From Swiss-Prot:
Organism, as annotated: Saccharomyces cerevisiae (strain ATCC 204508 / S288c)
Pfam families associated with the record: Alpha-amylase (PF00128), Alpha-amylase_C (PF02806), CBM_48 (PF02922)
Active-site residue list: 356, 417
SUPFAM superfamilies recorded: (Trans)glycosidases (SSF51445), E set domains (SSF81296), Glycosyl hydrolase domain (SSF51011)
UniProt modified residues of type Phosphoserine: 190
Keyword Phosphoprotein part of the UniProt annotation: yes
InterPro entries on file: A-amylase/branching_C (IPR006048), Branching_enzy (IPR037439), Glyco_hydro_13_cat_dom (IPR006047), Glyco_hydro_13_N (IPR004193), Glyco_hydro_b (IPR013780), Glycoside_hydrolase_SF (IPR017853), Ig-like_fold (IPR013783), Ig_E-set (IPR014756)
Gene behind this protein: GLC3
Protein name: 1,4-alpha-glucan-branching enzyme
Extra information: Present with 1230 molecules/cell in log phase SD medium.
GO terms of biological process kind: glycogen biosynthetic process
Amino acid sequence: MYNIPDNVKGAVEFDPWLKPFADVLSERRYLADKWLYDITHATPDGSYQSLSKFARDSYKSYGLHANPETKEITYKEWAPNAERAFLVGDFNNWDTTSHELKNKDEFGNFTITLHPLPNGDFAIPHDSKIKVMFILPDGSKIFRLPAWITRATQPSKETSKQFGPAYEGRFWNPENPYKFVHPRPKFSESVDSLRIYEAHVGISSPEPKITTYKEFTEKVLPRIKYLGYDAIQLMAIMEHAYYASFGYQVTNFFAASSRFGTPEELKELIDTAHSMGILVLLDVVHSHASKNVEDGLNMFDGSDHQYFHSISSGRGEHPLWDSRLFNYGKFEVQRFLLANLAFYVDVYQFDGFRFDGVTSMLYVHHGVGAGGSFSGDYNEYLSRDRSFVDHEALAYLMLANDLVHEMLPNLAVTVAEDVSGYPTLCLPRSIGGTGFDYRLAMALPDMWIKLIKEKKDDEWEMGSIVYTLTNRRYGEKVVAYCESHDQALVGDKTLAFWLMDAAMYTDMTVLKEPSIVIDRGIALHKMIRLITHSLGGEAYLNFEGNEFGHPEWLDFPNVNNGDSYKYARRQFNLADDPLLRYQNLNEFDRSMQLCEKRHKWLNTKQAYVSLKHEGDKMIVFERNNLLFIFNFHPTNSYSDYRVGVEKAGTYHIVLNSDRAEFGGHNRINESSEFFTTDLEWNNRKNFLQVYIPSRVALVLALKE
């Protein structure tokens, strides 16, 4: 008999395999709950404050803030290793003595208030350059961008030649800040489907250039709405000095990337998305930070252990990413990161977050090397001796979920990028879980690419495909996808490219009959996406361009490609060209999203799979009263194919991958009705018979 602590009883009831590890789970929850208590009582008199108040008060007090009524500017910075601090910039001609931050408190916080100029203007002009200078214990001086800076820009070529390429901090205080006019879309995480369009603003144009927030708003948002997605996951928003890092080497956590435009233009983008009923999620990077010193957090106050684990501890640097690792056990680090989330929810109206690098956070080995080979043995996650879990990082993730769900009750979406399969990651905090709403189903793209690369079509194992698509923890929702930005990067190929390769350059025209390669590629591209969408999870994600089979890979400008933008773009023009077959894939993707929107299968109970036939290469399943039929056989078509179904009645076709407009062959009569026979078949109470051609998928629904 196991004694199950009260604070994890709910989680153990969900997953009985947790029983032997209940004490460890309980300790992990206790640490987060203790931190939560400490934070919510970190007031002058020890009275209670909510977690969201703590986070909001933090981003409103730290950094630079302009008071429109008094015209005063306040600046607060935490730099415990510094002896003195001075604010310098264009506003005081970079005078290193005139504006000293006073009142260094016991925690290492410096503050200054700048009174308005005699003419009543703010002492620091809008968008002017600014830095903080610290004097260290040894008397040396260092210049940094304020840690909470809300705008940082690339220096001009002249400045770069003279002072180096470090980003420049700017005081952002526009006279007419953008005012949101549209409410957040109505979304209930418990019942509504999440169809996510993963996008990177900078590459969102067919032209070899950096796309702007404004262009994305005008040209890409209508495209996403047309396709039927109800959420956008925006990458590379947090400021990063190195464009080719894809946004994952963050330098300035509170600054929206200036490459794409201004903070106000990003607000307009999000507000416009909301007007279209589209949620906007931020791809948030709290797993590590750029090593940049002059324009980043590294060595910010002259020490290597202010925000991060010290280098000497062996925990301060990521072994593969060449980046710094946060010390989540520090109160001020918790403040900084939690305030960062609150800032994006409030100031930019983001509706949730996809947390990057969760596996790296969860384990002290960061999922690298031997420790990163997870077999699914619960000891790897929960054993005292063998799990190598970073309890402090896990506790931080629990607090992050507490905060986001407190700020956006019944609306917030949090997604974990975890490849390890950590149990309880997506169970509610209240029962002992980590609190995420979804985890990414990271095994799915690997499966599809491995199949296409290594197996002939007639060697595909239906049972193996179904197992991988349905292999998820009970009660923990996943975001299914067959490819994301990871698969599009240089060195890998998109699904379409694996399927059709060089033929995409010559044979995608509608002016001639499709080649065998193109015909197969288009058919399988549709089937793979539909079966992943309908069987693989409780939400779905697509990386921009892949919906229409974008050819080629992604490669950001860097020294190895001569700083070329040729592959750092999305060729939407291909999908808009009526003479190319990309439009067929685009239209199928739209119909698939709209079919899900109408009939809802994602955020429902897992499917019942009634058939996995290896010889016929058939997969049949039901989900939310819909009947899904897939024929993966490369050559065989079947007439009067018997299919089991639980509910009796008359069925009709609601989605058919063989339509000509989807690049199919129009072999299906969509006006057909299918009547059930009251005889058991494949463990279902009834059966019906269908014509199902080779490499075709059908979705049937009961006629109302």
